[in-house]
């Protein structure tokens, strides 16, 4: 970046010129940054819309809600479990993936308004807190928090939840009623694995983990 030593300019006219040029540079830099940010926001929204409109695949899954049941109009713990199951499936896969909440299976943007009514603070902060608590309850491994990045982009006027899940360095199990369940993202669905099947899969998927233990 260009820097100017003010001590080199002692005359008033040079100081005025310097200040004017500095202000002009600042104004133009500010305009450039705003334009870049606006372009980035437009790019991000366009890219996310492409993800939303694409069919579900090995790296993309959509969920209408986190805990709001559209049929009963009330909270449904099994919906919360399905979120943890999807996260577990991506974490256990080779590539990880993206989970979108507030978008139905057909790609229609629903938003999070109904979920917000059921969580603390009734906003994205409360939503993320309850989501992370729920995930920890079902997956019981704090490493999951390191694997997920949660954001709340606005698309077509609706706020949704985007969860980017990195592949886990070790096997992740889901716990319910004292039992372990195993899921892996395969194709466009999250598949259950019997324990013996998951053991065989884990030997390939987590070979490095087992070689160190």
Predicted regions mapped to residue ranges:
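Conserved N-terminal catalytic/coupling substructures associated with nucleotide/phosphate chemistry
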Residues: 1-213
């Amino acid at each position: 970046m260009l820097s100017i030593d003010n001590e080199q300019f002692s005359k008033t006219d040079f100081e005025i010129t310097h200040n004017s040029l500095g202000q002009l540079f600042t104004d133009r830099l500010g305009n450039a940054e705003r334009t870049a940010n606006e372009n980035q926001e437009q790019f991000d929204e366009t890219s996310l819309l492409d993800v939303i409109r694409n069919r579900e695949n090995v790296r993309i899954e959509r969920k209408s809600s986190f805990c709001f049941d559209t049929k009963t109009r009330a909270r449904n713990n099994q919906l919360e479990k399905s979120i943890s199951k999807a996260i577990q499936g991506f974490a256990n896969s080779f590539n990880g993936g993206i989970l979108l909440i507030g978008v139905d299976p057909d790609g229609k943007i629903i938003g999070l308004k109904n979920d917000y009514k059921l969580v603390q603070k009734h906003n994205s902060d409360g939503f993320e807190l309850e989501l992370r608590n729920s995930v920890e309850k079902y997956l019981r491994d704090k490493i999951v928090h390191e694997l997920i990045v949660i954001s709340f982009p606005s698309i077509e006027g609706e706020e949704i939840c985007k969860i980017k899940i990195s592949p886990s360095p070790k096997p992740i199990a889901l716990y319910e009623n004292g039992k372990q369940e195993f899921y892996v993202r395969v194709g466009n669905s999250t598949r259950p694995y019997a324990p013996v099947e998951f053991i065989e899969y884990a030997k390939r998927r987590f070979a490095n983990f087992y070689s160190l233990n």
